[in-house]
């Protein structure tokens, strides 16, 4: 059994009266549920639960932010002393005193007006009480003079205020014009700063440092020329040494002749003395150069029992092993610097081998060591061992590097031909170098980021590979009937 609702139904009159008394309320449960379901839901805000995000600036922004003084000259400060600061304070005090005096002057003017008005009234009362002792014309003149004076005074005061306002307006206009002029000047200055000329860049550099770099480069070139000159002078006796017989035949001839033995001993002593001097020079250079002294750790050579030639060989081998690390660092450093000056440095390489550094290139060149040694032990056409009809033979007791020697000579000739003291040619080379550097710079469109510029690729036109659809009114039956009628 369902229970009957205890709530009695309301009449129409009761509903209308309730709506008139409370128009915003609804008595039905359905309306209230509808309002709850469709009405806006509000959540209480609690400050403790809500945490603001961390809006601190990053280190990158701090480093790249520009001060106002760097952006425009208007915001640059001026260095002042304490004396100037005290003078400014005294000027401010004087201005305050002048303002106070002007207030006192205004009060005096008002008092003077009141006295004039009071004096005029008293004079008129005395004249009437005396029974018109003076003539009416004089009294009228006095009154007219007083009224004229009052009018002139008031008119003069009004004009003075107008002049002040006009002066203030003119000063404001002048100030606005000056500020606009300053803005224009600042914009012009900023535009001039943005358009930096190459001469300005060259003038801002440290000339003394550039001079020192130029002198260092000249010293390096002189050292290279002296070493190449030494190599040219040694070419004569190296070619003569390669013409000597093999060591076995030379020892056999020396055993037969005492004079030849003494000559060989003297040559060995002189060559060993020369080699000793070169090693001492190398150690002195290591001690003199601080960077090499830190990078190259010298080891004391072990005393080997044996002939002097073997001792020299072990010392040279140990020195070479110690210098490998420093040599690679120097080669990589200068190879990276010279890559920027070579033409076509910014162009993509066709092969992966061209992207190798200088160390990998040297390693790949020395990979086939046996072939290189055989090439250096093969006599060339300029030597006497090789005759016209005899085949080329490998002689292990000689060392021929004429290919490398001729390459060095070609480099020396090209360097002497390219270098000149004429300033016009030097400026032309400098301009060509600047053009080359500008070409190597990658042109980047700064406005194309963040989706501000659409990037698209134009596709080729569509090609239709379908068979053509014939639009003909003839049916197959009519076509076959036509073909049959042709061969009747």
From Swiss-Prot:
It holds the Pfam family AATF-Che1. Residues 71-85, 148-159 have a biased composition (Basic and acidic residues). Its main location: nucleus. InterPro entries: AATF (IPR025160), AATF/Bfr2 (IPR039223), AATF_C (IPR012617). One of its GO terms (cellular component) is nucleus. Residues 71-206, 290-309 are annotated as: Disordered. GO terms for biological process: negative regulation of programmed cell death; oogenesis. Residues 86-108, 160-193 have a biased composition (Acidic residues). The modification Phosphoserine is found at residues 26, 28, 32. Keywords: Nucleus, Phosphoprotein. It is found in: Nucleus. May function as a general inhibitor of the histone deacetylase HDAC1. Belongs to the AATF family. This is Protein Aatf.
């Amino acid at each position: 059994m369902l229970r009957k609702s205890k709530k009695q139904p309301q009449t129409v009159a009761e509903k209308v009266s309730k709506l008139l008394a409370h128009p915003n309320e609804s008595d039905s449960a359905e309306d209230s549920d509808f309002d709850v379901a469709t009405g806006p839901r509000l959540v209480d805000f609690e400050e403790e639960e809500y945490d603001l995000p961390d809006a601190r600036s990053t280190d990158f922004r701090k480093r790249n932010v520009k001060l106002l003084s760097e952006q425009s000259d208007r915001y640059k400060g001026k260095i002042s002393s304490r004396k100037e600061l005290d003078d400014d304070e005294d000027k401010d005090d004087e201005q305050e005193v002048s303002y106070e005096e002007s207030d006192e002057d205004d009060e005096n003017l008002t008092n003077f007006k009141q006295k004039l008005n009071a004096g005029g009234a008293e004079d008129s009362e005395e004249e009437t009480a005396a029974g018109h002792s003076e003539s009416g014309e004089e009294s009228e003149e006095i009154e007219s003079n007083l009224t004229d004076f009052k009018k002139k005074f008031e008119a003069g005061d009004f004009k003075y205020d107008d002049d002040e306002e006009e002066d203030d307006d003119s000063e404001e206009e002048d100030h606005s014009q000056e500020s606009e002029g300053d803005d224009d000047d600042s914009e012009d200055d900023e535009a001039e700063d943005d358009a930096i000329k190459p001469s300005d860049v060259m003038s801002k550099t440290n000339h003394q440092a550039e001079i020192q770099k130029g002198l260092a480069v000249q010293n390096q070139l002189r050292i290279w020329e002296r070493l190449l000159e030494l190599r040219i002078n040694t070419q004569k006796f190296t070619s003569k040494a390669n013409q000597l017989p093999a060591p076995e035949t030379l020892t056999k001839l020396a055993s037969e002749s005492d004079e030849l033995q003494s000559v060989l001993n003297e040559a060995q002593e002189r060559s060993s003395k020369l080699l000793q001097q070169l090693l001492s020079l190398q150690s002195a250079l290591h001690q003199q150069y601080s960077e090499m002294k830190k990078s190259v750790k010298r080891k004391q050579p072990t005393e080997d029992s044996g002939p002097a030639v073997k001792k020299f060989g072990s010392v040279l081998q140990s020195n070479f092993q110690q210098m490998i690390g420093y040599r690679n660092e120097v080669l990589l450093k200068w190879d990276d610097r010279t890559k920027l000056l070579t033409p076509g440095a910014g162009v993509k390489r066709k092969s992966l081998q061209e992207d190798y550094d200088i160390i990998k290139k040297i390693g790949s060149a020395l990979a086939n060591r046996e072939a290189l040694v055989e090439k250096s032990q093969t006599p060339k056409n300029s030597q006497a061992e090789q005759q016209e009809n005899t085949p080329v033979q490998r002689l292990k007791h000689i060392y021929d590097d004429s290919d490398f020697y001729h390459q060095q000579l070609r480099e020396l000739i090209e360097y002497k031909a390219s270098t000149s003291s004429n300033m016009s040619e030097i400026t032309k080379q400098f301009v060509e170098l600047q053009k080359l550097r500008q070409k190597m710079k990658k042109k980047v469109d700064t406005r194309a980021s963040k989706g501000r510029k659409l990037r698209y690729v134009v596709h080729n036109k569509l090609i239709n590979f379908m068979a053509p659809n014939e639009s003909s009114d003839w049916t197959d039956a009519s076509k076959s009937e036509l073909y049959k009628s042709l061969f009747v």
